[in-house]
A protein has these predicted regions:
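Glycine- and Gly-Pro-enriched alpha-helical subdomains that act as flexible
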Residues: 26-30, 36, 43
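Membrane-embedded glycan transfer/ligation machinery
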Residues: 46
Length: 488
């Protein structure tokens, strides 16, 4: 009811109004006479979904009766139910709801598969999906293990988005107008002028996402005076520097919430309309290590339009489950199916010099099977040590370039007081040996194949054999002997 509504998220738009005893809605102006009409939140959703259904029907040339719907990752079951109810009134049967970041990642992986990079979509990787919208931003850190997605953490900011960047442009344009037209007054104090500036600022921001220059051009901004202002991208990026830094901090905070380091992130997938902004991707590129791939239109020409990623993912999911019975779909999304045990630590083998090679990464849903091959250049007997490992961040000081004691003319004493640059790298170490297995008489230059199977009860079976050889070694380690796991 209205008493449970938090109106703070609406401060920049229409404010909710109490309808009837406890209903929630808005007052809108409709028709040529702009008569005020009360309309409930449900009716707003119904009208919107009807419009979407009709647009889809016009494009496909046939009626649309069911759909997969994407929702924010912080949607409650009550909110999902309310949206499904509104969809039903709009003539749509919602066969499944999926979270927007998962839908976006599904669309991205499907494109990799379609482009011939199918194996890439199945790699074990940590993906951060940053959904940067017009009025809010949402982050999800997802572990992709063999094509199965596990959400490790989510973060939400209801104040950070494209409109935040628009405000920077509005402030700049208003000040520039007032400098030259003081007698006309400050346009920020006139509601109609603010509306014109807001509309134009959004257009300028979008133009600066694809070009180096854009211009404000507003007829009769205030007191009948027209206004034009050229805005170079460099000027825009300087003005909005603090906002761009906020996006980077927000994304890094989500990584920390997942109890990870930025070195753990393999891919950052930018989605949402504001992701078109080149400076956001550039800042992430400089802040994250070179091993992290940033997927955005500005640095990846083949990237899918970020405004369409989530909806493409929903369409792909719909095509996958459209032939299933509704009861089967519902049963497959029950907690007993979706909440499964995961490995808490990586499992791998201990190599020479106590180096640890990961075979089954942390946060892998089980049951799971992984295989690795170990080269044996010298041949002979080989000892395989299966262990549970741990990830550490190793920090070292970068060596300064040798100068032979000779200073350049530009060098100062202050430079010598600067701290050495830190070099951070991710290393894996053995934490607990789970089992040992020996392979005798491996040929010189041969390979040993190690297959690790983690069962649903977190027991581990190990199979070792020489590639091309006969026989092998196999065994099972019960969970009680040292395996750690967690349900997610």
């Amino acid at each position: 009811g209205f008493g449970n509504v938090d109106p703070t998220a609406c401060h920049g738009s229409a404010h909710p109004k109490k309808l009837g005893e406890d209903g929630v809605g808005f007052v809108v102006k409709e028709g040529e006479g702009e008569e005020e009409t009360e309309i409930s939140v449900e009716e707003v959703a119904v009208r919107h979904l009807k419009r979407l259904r009709q647009s889809a029907a016009d494009y496909l040339g046939r009626e649309v009766g069911s759909a997969v719907l994407t929702v924010p990752s912080d949607f409650t079951e009550e909110q999902k139910s309310a949206v499904s109810k509104a969809a039903s009134k709009a003539g749509l049967e919602i066969i499944q709801t999926i979270h927007e970041p998962v839908a976006a990642l599904l669309a991205h992986d499907a494109k990799l598969l379609q482009s011939g990079e199918g194996d890439e979509s199945k790699h074990d990787k940590i993906v951060l999906v940053a959904d940067l919208g017009g009025i809010r931003s949402d982050i999800a850190v997802i572990a992709s293990r063999g094509g199965i997605y596990t959400t490790l953490a989510t973060a939400h900011d209801y104040e950070l988005g494209g409109s935040t960047l628009d405000k920077v442009l509005i402030e700049y344009a208003a000040k520039e107008f007032f400098k030259k037209n003081k007698s006309a007054g400050d346009p920020r104090e006139n509601a109609r002028s603010v509306a014109k500036l807001t509309l134009e600022a959004e257009a300028v921001r979008k133009a600066l996402s694809i070009g180096q220059n854009a211009s404000f051009s507003i007829e009769s901004l205030i007191d009948g005076r027209d206004f034009t202002l050229a805005v170079p991208r460099t000027r825009y990026e300087l003005l909005a520097n603090k906002v761009f830094a906020s996006f980077t901090r927000f994304i890094e905070a989500a990584v920390q919430k997942a109890e990870l380091d930025i070195l753990d992130i393999d891919t950052i997938l930018l989605t949402g309309g504001t992701s078109h902004t080149p400076k956001i991707a550039a800042n992430l590129q400089s802040h994250f290590p070179s091993t992290t791939t940033i997927i955005a239109p500005s640095n990846s020409p083949t990237a899918t339009n970020p405004s369409e990623l989530a909806v493409r993912g929903a369409a792909i999911q719909a095509s996958l489950i459209s032939e299933f019975e509704k009861e089967d779909i519902e049963s497959s999304t029950e907690a007993v199916v979706t909440v499964t045990p995961h490995t808490h630590h990586p499992i791998g083998i201990v190599l020479g010099n106590d180096n640890f090679a990961v075979i089954v990464p942390a946060d892998t849903p089980v049951p799971a099977r992984r295989t690795a091959q170990i080269p044996v250049p010298a041949g002979g007997d080989v000892l395989i040590r299966l262990a549970e490992g741990m990830r550490e961040i190793k920090v070292t000081k970068a060596e300064k370039a040798a100068t032979n004691g000779i200073k350049d003319a530009d060098d100062s004493d202050e430079d010598s007081d600067e701290e050495d640059e830190e070099v951070r790298e991710r290393v894996f170490k053995s934490k607990k040996v789970l089992a040992e297995a020996g392979i005798k008489g491996v040929k010189k230059g041969g390979k040993v194949e190690v297959q690790v199977n983690v069962q649903a009860d977190l027991s581990v079976s190990l199979v070792c054999r020489e590639v091309g050889g006969k026989g092998g070694v196999r065994g099972t380690i019960e969970k009680a002997q040292g395996m750690n796991g967690s349900a997610k």
